[in-house]
């Protein structure tokens, strides 16, 4: 199978207002149905056979399942999605029938009050009901993504126990919990209020690993054994009961040499790197032009990977691709300096 996969941000709209996100300031113009279908065709013309639907909130897109069925008809062999889980209870069967093979669900707390505080909506029960519906009605692998912050790090064991209980009930490896470091990816984190929030809530990889010691031996495993291999993720086994993942790009200084993601933004831009200075408009082009543009970008990225497989790359213009809004200029050392000033000069990253 082609190493490349299409990461398709199909809408910038979202019904949550997470404290670490920038959804209020997103440029939210959606692509036309014809452009979406032609992008799917153009990627397929370049040998891409995997797709990951994102947003915004992809299930906020009314006809998302129609596009998934179209992708299935074109020959996409694997379809996955990242969602906040709010609509899952109502959409589980449709997603299953549209070709979904696995799903990432963003969930940062099991506490109802804290959930409302983090996402701005009283909807924890909706998300948990959605997870339960997916477990009962589909065979999808479920990856729960928890953004770990100072405010919720004490819940790490709750998430692991939740996965252990459900894996016993529905089958081994139905749920994988992934702990995501709160790292700078948002223009708001360059403003005074956002900067203070990030510095205060930032958690290191070591902090996460220390919370796992109560489960005994932690064994790192080959990430390629995990369905939906992500080169940025490290996976571990805990007592042979559960697989967990850790994404700590900030602690690792942004390794990106193995990335094969063709990214489409909700604003109709295409790139092969979130931190690339070259962001191309793909909407409005003919199918032939879309196919040619994707071919050129993939070829460019392959040459970069061939030259430097251990490449590390962090670009300063936060949010330009994710949110359609560019932040101030800054580099990774600026963020390390923020942490030193906020937490002490000897702080770990």
Where does each model-flagged region fall?
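Canonical Radical SAM [4Fe-4S] cluster-binding loop centered on the CxxxCxxC motif
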Residues: 1-34, 273
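N-terminal [4Fe-4S]-dependent radical SAM core
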Residues: 1-7, 17-19, 45, 233-245, ...
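Conserved beta-strand segments that form the floor/walls of ligand-binding pockets within enzyme
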Residues: 5, 9, 22, 52, ...
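Residue-level signature of catalytic and energy-coupling elements of molecular machines
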Residues: 10, 177, 268
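Residue-level recognition of short loop/turn positions
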Residues: 17, 55, 267-268
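A short acidic, helix-capping loop that chelates divalent metal ions and anchors anionic groups
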Residues: 26, 111-118, 186-191
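Radical SAM/AdoMet-radical enzyme domain recognition
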Residues: 33-53, 57, 61-180
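Accessory C-terminal segments flanking Radical SAM cores
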Residues: 184-322
């Amino acid at each position: 199978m082609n190493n490349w996969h299409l990461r398709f941000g199909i809408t910038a709209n979202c019904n949550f207002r997470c404290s670490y996100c920038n959804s209020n300031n997103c440029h939210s113009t959606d692509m036309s149905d014809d452009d979406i279908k032609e992008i799917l065709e153009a990627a397929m013309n370049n040998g891409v056979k995997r797709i990951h639907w994102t947003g915004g909130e992809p299930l906020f897109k009314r006809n998302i399942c129609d596009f998934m069925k179209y992708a299935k008809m074109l020959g996409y062999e694997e379809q996955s999605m990242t969602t906040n889980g709010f609509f899952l209870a109502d959409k589980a069967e449709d997603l299953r029938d549209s070709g979904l093979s696995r799903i990432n669900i963003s969930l940062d707390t099991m506490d109802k009050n804290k959930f409302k505080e983090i996402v701005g909506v009283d909807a924890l029960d909706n998300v948990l009901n959605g997870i339960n519906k997916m477990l009962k009605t589909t065979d999808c692998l479920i990856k729960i993504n928890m953004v770990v912050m100072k405010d919720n790090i004490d819940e790490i064991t709750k998430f692991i126990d939740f996965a252990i209980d459900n894996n016993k009930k529905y089958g081994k490896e139905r749920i994988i919990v992934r702990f995501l470091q709160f790292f700078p990816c948002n223009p708001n984190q360059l403003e005074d209020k956002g900067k203070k929030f990030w510095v205060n809530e930032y958690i290191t990889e070591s902090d996460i690993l220390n919370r796992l010691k109560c489960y005994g031996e932690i064994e790192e495993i080959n990430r390629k054994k995990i369905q939906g291999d992500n080169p940025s993720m490290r996976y571990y086994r805990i007592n042979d009961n559960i697989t967990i993942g850790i994404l700590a790009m900030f602690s690792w200084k942004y390794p990106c040499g193995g990335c094969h993601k063709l990214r489409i933004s909700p604003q109709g831009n295409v790139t092969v790197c979130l931190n690339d200075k070259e962001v191309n408009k793909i909407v409005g082009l003919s199918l032939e032009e879309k196919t040619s543009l994707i071919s050129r970008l993939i070829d460019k990225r392959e040459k970069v990977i061939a030259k430097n497989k251990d490449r590390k790359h962090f670009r300063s213009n936060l949010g330009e691709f994710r949110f359609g809004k560019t932040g101030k200029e800054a580099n990774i050392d600026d963020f390390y300096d923020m942490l030193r000033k906020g937490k002490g000069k000897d702080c770990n990253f």
